[in-house]
Structures are given as structure tokens and as C-alpha cells.
Amino acid sequence: MGIFIDQTGYLPVSRKVATTTFPCNFQLIDSTTQHAVYDGVSTDSGMDESAGEQVYQLDFSKVNAPGHYYVLAGNGERSHTFVIGEHVYKQLQLDLMKCFYFQRCGCALTSEYAGEYTHAACHTEDAVFLEDYMNQTPDPPHFDMTGGWHDAGDFGRYISPAAVAVGHLLYAYELFPESFQTSLHIPESGNLLPDILNECLYELKWMLKMQADNGGVYHKHHYTLRI
């Protein structure tokens, strides 16, 4: 049971659909006035194989007025309150961009910029080639590979995903520079560069360290525990 909506919200001109696992009549309620602004009937969308449940759509796309709303089914079930508005994705964009800062490796995240998610500088040791490490080569060459972003929920840092992420961010800025002028509240904020470029630079400086003398690029920098 339950009524599932987009908790980020809906643009006024976008399609607006909630989903349920039961057929119903429904109303869209203005949460400020508690008045119904739309009445509708669910439509059967068939079986969702991944969920193993029958799914029904509650379409209220005709409602375009900005405001706070919730969906109320005829059986009394109601959704969380959500927003219809022009700027529903703005905070989501800022949150997504700030995620790159929280992935930073090799520097301390302080409460000024990270709030409760602080930690000391991590993974600051020099790197060695995996073969030298596994073979316990005496006095192997050491490399400064500090910096960059942690990748994929672990402590590895990989050139291929890094290049894709930085490339997409730079291309997004090239196409829509006006959309990336808001401060992300990172240590570099206020240095006359948009923070999307500041964050890309943090990763690019690490990527430069990963380039070998022959022009090639090492694939990844990771951590191995000897047990």
C-alpha cells in the first residue's frame, strides 16, 4: 500500500504522475488550504516485474499552479506533501554538485564546509606499483598520487570514471554556464572561478599526477590490505 510521488517535486508544465499498488479514485489536495483542486481516477499500468506488483498511475498533469500538494486516495491513503514549482530542481542540482566535494580524497573535510560529515585528510601516503607491493620489492619507486575523488563508494580512484565525470561537468558548464553560478560553499568558493570549475580542478590535478613519463595514464590508485 502507499502512494508514491516524486519527492523532489514537479515542474508546472511537466507530466505529473503518482503511482499506487491499488486502483482508486483520488484527489489532489492543496496542503495550504486543504481544498481539493483536482479529482481523478487511477489507470492500470500493468505488472511491474522488478517490484512484483500491479501498478496504477494517478495522473494530475492538468494542475499547473505552483504550490504544496498531496494526493489523497478514496480509501484514505495519502502521499507525502510535494511541490509544484519552477525551481524544484535547483536544490537538487546544488546537492548533486556538492557531492563531489564530499568525495574528495587527500584533504580534510572541515565542519565549515562539510557540516557533520567531517574527516581528517585521508590516503596521503605515497603510492607504489602493485607488483612492487605484492613482491615486497626493496626500495621501490614512490609516487605522489594524492587528491582526486573517491569512486564507487570505496577508496579507489579510477581514471576512466574520473575522465567521464569531469568531461560531463565541463561540457555542462560550456553549454549552460548561467546554471552554474551559485556557490557550493567549498574551500575555493569566492576565488572568481565558478565552483563547478573549482571542483573539476581538484580532480584534474589528481589526473595529471596519474600520467606516466611516457604519456600513458595509470588506470587506478587503490589500497590493498595484506592479511
Residue ranges and their predicted role:
Residues 73, 166-187, 203-210:
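Well-ordered alpha-helical scaffold segments within catalytic/enzyme domains
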Residues 50, 78-94, 179-199, 209, ...:
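Acidic/aromatic-lined carbohydrate-recognition and catalytic surfaces
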Residues 99-161, 186-227:
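Extended ligand-binding groove/face enriched in aromatic
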Residues 23, 55, 66-68, 79, ...:
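Extracellular structured ligand-interaction cores
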Residues 29-31, 43-46, 96, 169-176, ...:
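Catalytic cores of eukaryotic secretory-pathway lumenal/extracellular enzymes that build
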Residues 13, 90-93, 97-101:
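Short S/T/G/P-enriched beta-strand
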Residues 2-87:
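Ligand-binding face of N-terminal immunoglobulin V-set domains in extracellular IgSF glycoproteins
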Residues 13-15, 154, 176, 222:
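Short capping/connector residues at structural and topological boundaries
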